[in-house]
């Protein structure tokens, strides 16, 4: 739903400070896990933003995002060649400055409902002879569709999931920070060519009101 914004000053000045922290593949357990086709990961990103002038009101906000989980090659422990697994969760916390700025698209690309939730979790099967892979589970469409690798360098959410999709889909569609049940088929005959198709639950909240308590 598009929000109508009124009585907002034209000039808005933002001060931002982003503090990304990443901790991956650390410790003896993770080293052992890698030998068994297991990768345990933890990433933390935080940011402080201030609306100094303009917008709806001035003020400062803080956002934090912790991502954690594991990825496993099931060929080594179970003999399921070409099969991989991902289980992940996330912790969103803090209070951003979106309401202070009066934005339609997020000023921050890590802002969302404060919650600890199950995140991307799927099983993928690769068929090497046909150059195909099939992935199914809790998926994010913006991980593989309508996105650019270079967009990760920017803070503003307009560089991520396109507005023409989010504004015309119930509860923004299957994108950060709510995955949806779905499946994706990828055909990649070589490094220069690929085609893919995906099917996703159209309402990842399963609620027309976007109630964050549903998930």
What are these regions (language model features)?
Residues 42, 68-74, 120-125, 136, ...:
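Residues on the lipid-exposed face of transmembrane beta-strands in outer-membrane beta-barrel proteins
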Residues 2-13:
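Bacterial N-terminal signal peptides that target proteins for export
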Residues 36, 48-50, 60-66, 115-119, ...:
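Residues that define the transmembrane beta-barrel architecture of outer-membrane proteins
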Residues 25-39, 73-85, 128-131, 192:
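Short loop/turn motifs that connect adjacent beta-strands in outer-membrane beta-barrel proteins
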Residues 23-39, 140-154:
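Outer-membrane beta-barrel biogenesis signature
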Residues 97-120, 130-215:
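Surface-exposed coil loops of outer-membrane beta-barrel proteins
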Residues 40-48, 85-91, 134-140, 195-201:
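Transmembrane beta-barrel strands of outer-membrane/channel proteins
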Residues 30-52, 83-87, 95, 157, ...:
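Transmembrane beta-strand segments of Gram-negative outer membrane beta-barrel proteins
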């Amino acid at each position: 739903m598009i929000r109508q914004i009124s009585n907002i000053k034209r000039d808005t000045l933002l001060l931002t400070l982003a503090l990304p922290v990443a901790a991956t593949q650390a410790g003896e357990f993770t080293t052992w896990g890698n030998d068994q086709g297991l990768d345990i990961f933890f990433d933390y990103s935080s940011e402080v933003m201030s609306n100094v002038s303009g917008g709806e009101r001035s003020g400062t906000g803080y956002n934090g995002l912790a991502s954690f989980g594991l990825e496993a090659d099931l060929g080594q422990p179970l003999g399921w060649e070409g099969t991989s697994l991902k289980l992940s969760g996330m912790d969103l916390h803090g209070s951003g400055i979106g309401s202070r700025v009066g934005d339609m698209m997020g000023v921050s690309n890590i802002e969302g409902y404060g919650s600890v939730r199950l995140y991307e979790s799927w099983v993928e099967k690769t068929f090497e002879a046909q150059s195909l892979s099939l992935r199914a589970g809790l998926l994010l469409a913006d991980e593989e569709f309508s996105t650019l690798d270079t967009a990760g360098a920017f803070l503003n959410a307009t560089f991520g999931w396109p507005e023409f999709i989010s504004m015309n889909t119930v509860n923004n569609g299957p994108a950060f920070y709510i995955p949806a049940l779905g499946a994706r088929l990828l055909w990649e005959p070589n490094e220069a060519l690929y085609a893919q198709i995906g099917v996703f639950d159209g309402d990842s909240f399963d609620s027309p009101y976007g109630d964050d308590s549903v998930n």
